[in-house]
Amino acid sequence: MAQESADLASDCQSWLQKLSAWEQASSEETQKDTCLHLSGFQEFLRQMYEILKEMDSDAILERFPTIGQLLAKACWNPLILAYDESQKIVIWCLCCLMNKEPRTSAESGLNSWIRGLLSHVLSAFRFDMKEVCLFTKSLGYESIDYYPSLLKNMVLSLVSELRESHLNGLSTQSRMAPERMMSLSEVCVPLVTLPDMEPLVEALLTYHGHEPQEVLAPEFFEAVNEAFLSEKIVLPTSSVVSLWFRHLPSLEKATLHLFEKLFSSKIICLRRMECCIRESFLPQAACQPAIFRIVDEMFRFVLLETDGAPEVLAALQVFTSCLVEALKKENKQLTFALRTYFPYGAPCLAAALSQHPEAIPQGHRLQPLLHISQLLREAVEDCTRGSPRNPFESWFLFVHFGGWVDLAVAELLLREEAEPPAGLLWLLVFYYSPQDGSQQREQSMVELKVLINRLLMLLRSGPLSATDLQEAAESPSGDPRPPVCGQLVRRLLLSLLLWTPEGHAIVWEAVTHGPTFEITGPGCCPRIWRSTRPQHRPRAHLCCTEMAHTDAVIHEIIGFLDQTLYRSQHLCVEASRKLARDLLKELQAQV
């Protein structure tokens, strides 16, 4: 104990010198030095309080004669008091110095001096602590009398000055100097989480000067962004947009923060994704094309790095849907042309894809689908003839709007015509195997057409069984044609089971209990865009095993069922949604 007290006495002298140096100067370097050493000073105060609370006032002053000076300097340093922990410990330490039963005028004078320090601290900053009531009542006042009038008035004054400076525009005499703006933003770094500072933080974020360089400190942007992402402060949309527009690292960190939330679960849940995306403010901010382009590029990078993982595709599509909704809410007439958001795709294609496919009446869906297929095909074939556009760009634009794929599958399986439209076949083959050349894509379309004809023939020929589905999806032995993408085959079979009365009868057997299908083969793999594609793809096949026994496949089915529920309002009847919900619960219980 004695050794610890001696060490703290030495530390007290060192910190007193440091506080005196901070007090004598208000330069940028001093502010940075204060912020740098705040955590160490907090730890010192914490250790000091543990000693002081066991001692009486006389013993404290005898052991630590300069403790009063140190605490007084701390009380007048706004950077120290900006932290809740520092505020609380300073008050506790001051309370320890109070003489409970003053017997001399010197002791009464000390108590009066300490009351003055406490009064300053409590009037300058807002506290929501039980200790405040105790301290203020001991001074003979109610806590309401110490509401933060001083800080509030200072903030309001600065906000008014910023607004006046902003309105004066190019008037250099009335405009706040860039150096002062920088200094003010640096001072605010440790204060951004204080509720009374919110108006000043918002005013700084939305202030736009006429200087060629940024006038606010990057540390200010980082502190505000960190506080916003950790939900310690609430900002209006305009302030958030300004923050991310002016400070690219903050936008990147916010996007990565969203990715961590979206991809933390192995199970895809689109409604949870939508909730996270809306709460992130990124769709609203992405109404600014510059912000959207950064977020979109980060999605592109993750999509490539994960080989087109289903959860990344799903997140991209939900984000795009939220963006389109935000654009319509912001202005019925788009402020920016769609080509500004998707500069690498054909403008007419972006306009066609941005429509809501679910809103199209059931009898009028084929023509928009065929139009999109034609536009995509022209763009892709134009790429092969030497156009500067990359085929990947057309595919990347297409996958933003996944609802059209659902619509294409529904049109193929639920139409009464004998021959499936070639445009829909091309659309699905391109979505699931974008890396294929035109000749290989034509072969896959033939294979897909054969599969769909077999499935539709089964529906017309009588009661359906899981074995029938199994046989219909198998390619004839020795067939040299390349198989249709396994992911696409599974999607067709599951859609057939959910969207037709014949499928309802066997869906439980096919998916959870009875013989079902495990299809191997390439899925949607964007990495092939930048690597060598294998010359021979494995044959898609069906085997009599339970689909639920393969983790990758069961997760794919869960994702498909969740997607069906998410987008099924105009695509499925109520019975299909009920089946999807029940199957989803059953499969989720197995993982």
From Swiss-Prot:
Keywords: Cytoplasm, DNA damage, DNA repair, Nucleus. GO terms for cellular component: cytoplasm; Fanconi anaemia nuclear complex. It is found in: Nucleus; Cytoplasm. The keyword Nucleus applies. One of its GO terms (biological process) is neuronal stem cell population maintenance. InterPro entries: FANCC. Ubiquitous. Pfam families: Fanconi_C. DNA repair protein that may operate in a postreplication repair or a cell cycle checkpoint function. May be implicated in interstrand DNA cross-link repair and in the maintenance of normal chromosome stability. Upon IFNG induction, may facilitate STAT1 activation by recruiting STAT1 to IFNGR1. Belongs to the multisubunit FA complex composed of FANCA, FANCB, FANCC, FANCE, FANCF, FANCG, FANCL/PHF9 and FANCM. This complex may also include HSP70. Interacts with ZBTB32. Upon IFNG induction, interacts with STAT1. Interacts with CDK1. Interacts with EIF2AK2. This is Fanconi anemia group C protein homolog. It comes from Mus musculus.
